[in-house]
Regions:
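C-terminal accessory/binding modules appended to enzymatic or scaffolding proteins
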Residues: 341-369, 377, 586-631
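Beta-strand/loop-dominated core regions that host nucleotide or nucleotide-derived cofactor-binding catalytic loops
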Residues: 402-403, 631-637, 641-666
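Catalytic alpha/beta core domains of metabolic enzymes, predominantly
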Residues: 138-152, 156, 182-342, 430, ...
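Active-site beta->alpha loop and helix N-cap motifs at the rims of alpha/beta catalytic domains
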Residues: 5, 12, 24, 52-53, ...
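Radical SAM enzyme core and accessory elements
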Residues: 370-382, 625, 632, 636, ...
Length: 678
């Protein structure tokens, strides 16, 4: 820490201590399995947290950006002793934002910072067990297992008693990638193991009548994270416990992808009434996390009102303890079909793009925006080409360019979907006619030229209306919920009725945003509202529509939503940590450089981690790892195994690429063939 961070050493405990008081709150959702929620700080709000990498200046920046608490990495005793002075400096400048000390491997450091911090975060996977060695340990008897828990109690109890005495709060924060060898031996690398790891520490707290703590269950995989929190809430409910939850998707990455993964995981839980504090973990400057945090917080705070508008129902077909995607049938080819209809949806998740006649008429730019490759001016499907297009307005019969685009897309298997009324007025050959479910009848006539039906649900249909709509044997259903209605709960209601009827109709989540909605809001809302359903296996694709928005951006966001929900991989997956006091290189710069050179490898996951303290454990899902090993030096991993140590920063990216090649996962970037004039 710099001199400016550690000046004026005379803070007293009274000056620096701001005890956090927990105020439980009754749940507002009666229809979900997880039936309680809580709020922190005597206010009915969801608090936002952010961790800076250099204390005083960045704490101020985070507080000014709206952070309601700030987490600081405390690596050792030197930093711990400086924290008293940092706190005093902040108070002198009028900043009373609570500070959280992030502790790993260091019980003595935790004891010291309890003197001046308002909250201590401990990781059950490494607080008493030391650094992960990824060794398989077999416990022959229960006594051996219990002996380790008794040793943990011996190490952890002094901190519990000190926090209780001083009114300091605690976060028991489990991470999917850093479970102890003991936990792994009995529960495996599972959400159940994450919950039990936290409960071991919680039982010690409760034994000493200390209840001023919160839980977190973080993972870089949103599906694992959501399942772990739901399981935690379920187990607490059975025990009669009501402790707050801190939500976060760890190592989410940067930019749109980081925001998308965070909104899928955090948003899914907030919309179910779970969560009290949140943190969006981005590989960006800490204060930039506040805007997506605020958007998620606001979604969570209005979730109650939106959910009240959904009719009550008894949900069936969704098990939060395990993941199983709802079974659906892709379109089948008929003998008399003039074009191939089998690819208008994708088995791993479909993307539909809403387009206009003007976009169709632009031809080559339109094909590129749709994700198609070009060969001599003709579109070809690529790995991230939209599977179907949706036309609210159909081009005029004399619009030669627009109609030519439709024909060319159909020739490469891209579907064309349009409202039944529009097709009745202006037919399109081989189109899919979309009809509102409330108007659908099994004997209704198909518009001229159309060859398949789609039905559109708004979430307010009766069971009879849903049954009647399915008599059309639609190839897909679109769910476009009514405004100010919870998409999550209205869609669950539709899926419940579909399950009762045994329907395997593919379902597309259709989200429509106002023209003036900013990009960040589109990402956050689509991730929370549709991602929460996809994480439960409810849905077969997405369509994000926004008048006037860039088609390429909406398509890219849609594919990002599918990849973040662990459905369809169309690009390289990155697991990258945010900067903290332990970071040994410029994370933002290095992550950008690696992304630039490796972003064309779908199915490959690369972790970029700032240090070896947490890095190897938190990158559990990655195929390759780039980890700070020492100042100026990088360690490279394949899976969880370090294969190269002490590589210079300057050559480490080249070495990483060579490692990917050596393991048979590299492909060269494709060079698009330019159109040739006739």
């Amino acid at each position: 820490m710099t001199t400016s961070d550690t000046r004026d050493v005379e803070a007293t405990v009274a000056e620096v201590r701001l005890p956090l008081v927990i105020s439980p709150r009754v749940s507002f959702f009666r229809r979900v399995n997880l039936s309680f929620a809580h709020r922190l700080f005597l206010t009915d709000r969801i608090a936002r947290a952010s961790p800076p990498s250099t204390p005083t200046r960045q704490v101020i920046k985070c507080a000014d950006a709206g952070a309601e608490m700030v987490r600081i990495t405390v690596q050792g005793m030197q930093e711990a002793k400086a924290c008293v002075e940092i706190k005093k400096t902040l108070l002198e400048r009028g900043y009373t934002t609570p500070l959280i000390a992030d502790i790993h491997f260091a019980p003595k450091v935790a004891m010291t910072v309890a003197e001046c911090f308002d909250k201590i975060r401990v990781n059950p996977g490494n607080f008493a067990d030391g650094r992960k060695k990824f060794e398989d340990i077999l416990y022959e008897t229960d006594e051996e297992y219990e002996a380790e828990i008794l040793e943990i109690e011996k190490i952890f109890t002094p901190l519990v008693l000190k926090c209780k005495e001083r009114g300091v709060a605690m976060r028991i924060g489990t991470n999917h990638g850093s479970l102890s060898a003991r936990t792994l031996s009995r529960f495996g690398d599972t959400p159940a193991g994450m919950v039990e790891s936290a409960f071991e520490f919680a039982r010690i707290c409760r034994k000493h009548d200390y209840h001023n703590f919160v839980f977190s269950m973080k993972a870089s995989n949103p599906l694992v994270m959501v399942q772990a929190y739901r399981l935690l809430a379920h187990e607490m409910y059975k025990l009669g416990w009501d402790y707050p939850l801190h939500l976060g998707v760890t190592e989410a990455g940067e930019g749109e992808d980081g925001r998308m993964k965070s909104s899928i995981g955090i948003g899914a839980l907030l919309l179910d009434g779970l969560g009290d504090t949140i943190r969006v973990s981005l590989t960006e400057a800490s204060h930039l996390e506040m805007e997506p945090c605020t958007r998620l917080r606001d979604l969570g705070m209005k979730a109650c009102a939106d959910a009240i508008g959904v009719d009550k129902f008894d949900e069936v077909g969704r098990d939060f303890k395990s993941f199983e995607r709802r079974e659906s049938d892709l379109p089948m080819q008929k003998e008399d079909d003039p074009i191939d209809m089998r690819n208008i949806l994708h088995r791993d998740g479909s993307v539909l793009s809403a387009v206009t006649p003007a976009q169709l008429a632009s031809e080559d730019p339109f094909y590129r925006d749709l994700g198609a490759k070009l060969a001599v001016g003709m579109p070809l499907r690529d790995i991230a080409t939209s599977d179907s297009i949706f036309l609210r307005e159909i081009p005029a019969a004399d619009d030669e360019k627009a109609n030519r685009s439709i024909r060319r897309l159909q020739e490469i298997g891209v579907g064309v979907v349009a409202p039944v009324a529009a097709l009745a007025a202006t037919p399109i050959d081989n189109a899919v006619a979309a009809v509102p479910a409330k108007e659908a009848k099994g004997d209704m006539a198909m518009p001229k030229g159309a060859v398949r039906w789609a039905v559109v649900f708004d979430g307010t249909e009766s069971a009879e209306e849903i049954k009647s709509a399915l008599e059309l044997e639609p190839v897909m259903a679109l769910i476009e919920t009514a405004p100010e209605t919870s998409r999550l709960h209205a869609s669950r209601r539709v899926f419940t009725e579909l399950n009762k009827l045994g329907s395997k109709t593919p379902v597309i989540h259709h989200m429509v945003f106002p023209a003036d909605e900013v990009k960040d809001a589109v990402v956050i809302q689509s991730g929370a509202q549709a991602g929460g359903l996809l994480c439960d296996g409810l849905g077969d694709g997405v369509m994000i529509e926004q008048p006037g928005a860039e088609l390429e951006y909406l398509r890219r966001t849609s594919f990002g939503l599918l990849q973040g929900s662990r459905m369809r991989n169309t690009k390289t997956e990155y697991v990258s940590c945010p900067s903290c006091g332990r970071t040994l290189f410029d994370l933002q710069e290095v992550t950008a450089a690696i992304s630039e050179r490796t972003g064309h490898l779908p199915g490959v996951a690369i972790a970029v981690m700032g240090c070896i303290v947490n890095g190897p454990g938190e990158m559990a899902d990655a195929d390759f790892g780039y980890v700070g090993g020492a100042p100026g030096k990088i360690d490279l991993y394949v899976g969880k195994e370090v294969v190269k140590r002490g590589i210079d920063n300057e050559t480490a990216c080249d070495e990483l690429i060579q490692l990917i090649k050596d393991n048979g996962r590299w492909v060269d970037k494709e060079v698009e063939e330019e159109a040739v004039a006739a």
